[in-house]
Amino acid sequence: MAAALRFDNIGKVFPGVRALDGISFDVQAGQVHGLMGENGAGKSTLLKILGGEYQPDSGGVLVDGQAMRFPSAAASIAAGVAVIHQELQYVPDLTVAENLLLGRLPSALGWVRKHTAQRFVRERLAAMGVDLDPQAKLRRLSIAQRQMVEICKALMRNARVIALDEPTSSLSHRETEVLFKLVDDLRRDGRALIYISHRMDEIYRLCDACTIFRDGRQVASHASLAQVPRETLVRQMVGREISDIYHYEPRALGDVRLSARALEGDALRSGASFDVRAGEIVGFFGLVGAGRSELMRVIYGADRRTGGALTLDGKPLDIRSTRDAIRHGIVLCPEDRKEEGIVAHASVAENINISCRRHALRAGLFLDLKREAETAERFIKLLKIKTPNRRQKIRFLSGGNQQKAILARWLAEPDLKVVILDEPTRGIDVGAKHEIYGVIYELAKRGCAIVMVSSELPEVLGVSDRIVVMREGRIAGELARGEANEEAVLNLALPQGAIAHAA
């Protein structure tokens, strides 16, 4: 019996880069096939070929034994294939129902039947266990909710082959469990699934088989994942041993650098108070919707501050815009890289230099292009950013390499004092995480105060000197590194009703 999906010797070349070289593996009906590899290994490129965005330069794709050619996304969808990319694709000013039914809205005499569409979508969402308002516009939803819309869109097309690229990267624990149930149901229903994730727990929880990519090549395939130790997968992914991914080292801390007192914003229910010392890494943990990102945006001047006070090195700080924050040496690496972090149409070099250009002016008028080029080359080498050259458009880089470029932007700032990192390793492989943690430690050694927001509890525990836990828009408590463990952090993060119910 033919495999539900077969990649046959797939090759793809971009200018200066061989993105894929001889990729061949099968995905069976009723199977979840994991795809792992470092950022830039070629996983997302393969899915773009499957989804009709790219054309292979060699090899081909077979669906149910039949050779297929996908000149467009529409051709891929028509063949029963659904690809859900890490970078979400939606229309922000349309509703949930309109996004889910885009191109097939029920109509009569040219008029769209909105009530019929909303009722249909509400029934389908309920059947999938997803709690979303069909009338809500995508722009007003969280990243996690938008992710669920994309997943539901693929499921509503009744696709036989479904590929998921980092689907849980922005989901809460509850939403992740809903997704896992959906994947299990689809497997039992005989669908063929490709599942890309950097989270080992997810791969072992969901996947029957697994293929490993490195530098565009297929380095290993495992028909039965249950028999493969985790250490083997990591070694095959990165080509080296990583015994301690966090490699935490204590360091001397200075005086209080950033202090927040009774800080309030439109999305913060009560005043938030905390301190961060020079050279200290303070991890912020909380469930989705706890208010962590909202608090960081208030500090950075991206959202309005409605109350409270900030001080920097003991002096009052009045930040009314992101420009004010950067001028005082406070920077933010945002959660949503695509929308708020990178300038997609600009080059890697331009993205690295965009903030510190004021330091590259000659006579206050002319850009020192040689200096900018040297700065970009230095950080590309230092952070091991995988790019053909500094002129490459940043949108063509993997998520991990885009994140490194954003970090390079702030490393290039000579007067850096506070670095806020919102989900700095979201959707990034284990090798790139290891390198990014090294950058965070280097910033701390320089005396920067580091505030790191993360939904990955092991990361918060592994990297932070101190942990602040938020719950329902408030700071619920804080823990020193020596007293912090998963149970203590979760007890602070979970709603009190949930804790009582669990007891």
Curated annotation (Swiss-Prot):
EC annotation from Swiss-Prot or TrEMBL: 7.5.2.12
- Membrane topology per the record? Peripheral membrane protein
One of the record's GO cellular component terms:
plasma membrane
Q: Name one Pfam family in it.
A: ABC_tran
Q: What is its main location?
A: membrane
Q: Which residues form the ABC transporter domain?
A: 5-240, 253-497
MF terms (GO), sorted A to Z:
ABC-type L-arabinose transporter activity; ATP binding; ATP hydrolysis activity
Keywords associated with the record: ATP-binding, Cell inner membrane, Cell membrane, Membrane, Nucleotide-binding, Repeat, Sugar transport, Translocase, Transport
The record's subcellular location field reads: Cell inner membrane
Instruction: Indicate which residues the UniProt annotation says bind ATP.
Output: G37, E38, N39, G40, A41, G42, K43, S44
Q: Which domain of life is it from?
A: Bacteria
Q: Does the record bear Nucleus in its keywords?
A: no
Q: What class of enzyme is it?
A: translocase
Q: Tell me the PROSITE patterns matching this sequence.
A: ABC_TRANSPORTER_1, ABC_TRANSPORTER_2, ARAG
Q: Which reaction does it catalyse?
A: L-arabinose(out) + ATP + H2O = L-arabinose(in) + ADP + phosphate + H(+)
Q: Does the keyword Oxidoreductase apply?
A: no
Which InterPro entries does this chain map to? AAA+_ATPase, ABC_carbohydrate_import_ATPase, ABC_transporter-like_ATP-bd, ABC_transporter-like_CS, P-loop_NTPase
Protein family according to the UniProt entry: Belongs to the ABC transporter superfamily. Arabinose importer (TC 3.A.1.2.2) family.
Function summary? Part of the ABC transporter complex AraFGH involved in arabinose import. Responsible for energy coupling to the transport system.
The family database entries (NCBIfam families) matched by this protein are listed as: PRK11288.1
Subunit-structure text: The complex is composed of two ATP-binding proteins (AraG), two transmembrane proteins (AraH) and a solute-binding protein (AraF).
Q: What is the recorded name of this protein? A: Arabinose import ATP-binding protein AraG 1
Provide the species name.
Burkholderia thailandensis (strain ATCC 700388 / DSM 13276 / CCUG 48851 / CIP 106301 / E264)
